[in-house]
């Protein structure tokens, strides 16, 4: 399956759909993004819609199956497509977080602790104190 993200006028992802791979293959069997875009514009009768292909297996610029990463991250509703970076970027979670230009993922100004946690524990970011808090549920 091939995934495509539909963008609004501000390049925000408003929907993500999948199409069978055969839809995006040309006469030589080579996948072409434009074929998928044309298919979706016709299917939804939206000739002016903006669609971008996205890879379900890509996160942080790494393809989970060892394939070629595509557009840094799999698109999700509410994410932004950045044409300069050719990447999908999640909304900034906290004002202090910084975009990693290589992964297009947001990072806290202080790395999350790497200590091993129990099953009922997790770390959460405390923006006011600029620190990670260990929480037990």
Predicted regions and their residues:
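Interaction-interface detector
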Residues: 1-137
């Amino acid at each position: 399956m091939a995934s495509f993200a539909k963008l609004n006028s501000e390049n925000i992802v408003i929907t993500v759909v999948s199409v069978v791979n055969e839809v995006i293959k040309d006469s030589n069997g080579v996948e072409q993004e434009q074929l998928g875009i044309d298919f979706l514009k016709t299917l939804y009768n939206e000739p002016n819609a903006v669609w971008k292909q996205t890879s379900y297996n890509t996160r942080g610029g790494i393809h989970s199956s060892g394939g070629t990463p595509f557009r840094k991250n799999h698109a999700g509703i509410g994410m932004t497509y950045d044409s300069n970076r050719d990447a999908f970027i999640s909304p900034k979670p906290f004002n202090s977080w910084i975009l990693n230009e290589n992964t297009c993922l947001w990072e806290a100004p202080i790395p999350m602790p790497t200590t091993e946690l129990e099953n009922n524990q997790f770390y959460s970011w405390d923006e006011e104190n600029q620190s990670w808090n260990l929480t037990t549920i």
